[in-house]
Swiss-Prot record:
Interacts (via C-terminus) with cognate toxin DarT; this heterodimeric complex neutralizes the toxic effect of DarT by preventing ssDNA binding to DarT and consequently inactivating the toxin by direct protein-protein interactions. Co-immunoprecipitates with a number proteins known to be involved in DNA metabolism, in the presence and absence of darT; includes alkA, dnaB, dnaE1, dnaG, dus, embR, mtrA, nrdE, nrdR, polA, recA, recB, recF, xerD, Rv2258c. Keywords: Hydrolase, Toxin-antitoxin system. Its EC number is 3.2.2.-. This is DNA ADP-ribosyl glycohydrolase. InterPro entries: ADP-ribose_metab_enzymes, Macro_dom, Macro_dom-like. Disruption phenotype: Cells lacking this gene display impaired growth. A double darT-darG deletion shows no change in growth in culture, upon infection of mice, or upon exposure to a variety of stresses. Another group finds the double knockout gives a competitive advantage over wild-type cells in liquid culture growth experiments. Knock-down of darG expression leads to increased RecA expression, ADP-ribosylation of OriC and growth arrest. The N-terminus macro domain alone is sufficient to neutralize DarT from non-cognate T.aquaticus in E.coli, DarT in M.bovis, and to de-ADP-ribosylate DNA in vitro. The C-terminus is a region interacting with the DarT toxin ssDNA binding region.
Length: 352
């Protein structure tokens, strides 16, 4: 799946990060300099490889970070021969062939890619973007996050006149009431707000309760994921909610998103006056009943993932459900035991 990112690529929540480099061992400006400062051991390995003549056009130079938390691989993509020379589209074409090979061979599930050869390289973004999209269409199961050259944090536009809608109301009311319920069940969790991961799972169950929300969930790295939910949150950021920022924070950082005073007032007024208020409350009631006892990022991810394999893949027996959840990603296989998945499955079947 191809999506677009903004802000700091080095904070992208992906297994691999792509860095643009030359073939002479210099990382003196742009994103390459940021990588050099963030990963000095990677730079040392790259510099030595250049001296040995191992960094060439059309060949990725991959460095494993050795980190348990954060990106596992830095993929150095040569976009020019010398740092003084311009990039060429032929270099991008050759490199993308090898990048796809590397992603397949290393079984990389997600990757963040900068605007290759644009900016200091002198290439036109439209030409490069077309090539990136074409290349990653070969890998439909890989989450490819493409960063356009504009970069920077997302500007919050038009928030003063933001109108409450049914979809926004469901998110806000689910957030408000879930936070109250989570405080009672998991008092050690952040009291200020709830994470994007948790909101995604709340809205997954809301969509199950009322399919007219049409949120179009797909199997993501951390369970069912909806790009539309993210867009709804981004649209409310700075007005009804605060904490998402530009959306580039790592998912597992569990950065808290909370209702603003304006958001609290808006949802209170909506529920008191709008004809759809009962429908909003009914959807949220169902969500909170289903997830009771599974509050927190770990629990709601487990419950939503188990629900997905039970309803989409027909895994309604404990053994098959456990196998399906644990093979979803290596991470799920590490953190979720068969017993815990079985408990989640019991809840799903009980509330069906």
């Amino acid at each position: 799946m191809i999506t677009y990112g903004s802000g700091d690529l080095l904070r992208a929540d992906t297994e691999a990060l792509v860095n643009t480099v030359n073939c002479v061992g210099v990382m003196g400006k742009g994103i390459a300099l940021q990588f050099k400062r963030r990963y000095p051991e990677m730079f040392t390995a790259y510099e030595k490889a250049c001296k040995r003549g191992e960094v060439t056009i059309g060949k990725m130079f991959v460095v494993d970070t050795g980190q348990l938390d954060g990106p596992k691989h830095i993929i150095n993509f040569p976009t020019k021969k010398h740092w003084r020379a311009p990039s060429k589209l032929a270099y991008i074409d050759a490199g993308l062939i090898d990048l796809i090979r590397v992603i397949r061979e290393l079984n990389i599930a997600s990757v963040a890619v900068p605007p290759l050869g644009v900016g200091n390289g002198g290439l036109d973004w439209e030409d490069v973007e077309q090539r990136l999209v074409s290349a990653f269409q070969q890998l439909p199961d890989v989450d490819a996050v493409i960063y356009p050259p504009s970069g920077g944090s997302r500007a919050i536009e038009g928030v003063e006149g933001l109108r409450m809608t049914w979809g926004r109301a469901v998110i806000l009311e689910a957030m408000r009431r879930y936070l109250q319920q989570r405080r009672a069940m998991e008092p050690w969790e952040d009291p200020a707000g709830i994470s994007h991961l948790e909101i995604q799972k709340l809205m997954y169950f809301a969509n199950e309760a009322d399919p007219d929300l049409a949120l179009d969930f797909t199997p993501g790295r951390y369970g069912p994921y909806s790009e539309r939910v993210r867009h709804l949150l981004q649209g409310m950021e700075g007005a009804f909610t605060v904490g998402l920022g530009d959306g580039t924070a790592r998912v597992l950082a569990n950065q808290p998103i909370s209702l603003t005073t304006k958001g609290t007032d808006a949802i209170t007024d909506y529920l008191a006056t709008d004809a759809a208020a009962d429908r909003v409350s009914a959807a949220v009631d169902t969500v909170l009943r289903v997830i009771e006892g599974f509050e927190g990022p770990y629990g709601v991810e487990l419950l939503a993932s188990t629900h997905w394999v039970a309803t989409r893949e027909g895994a309604k027996e404990p053994a098959t459900a456990a196998a399906a959840v644990r093979k979803w990603t290596k991470r799920k296989g590490r953190i979720y035991s068969d017993d815990r998945i079985g408990v989640a499955l019991d809840r799903i079947l009980m509330t069906a």
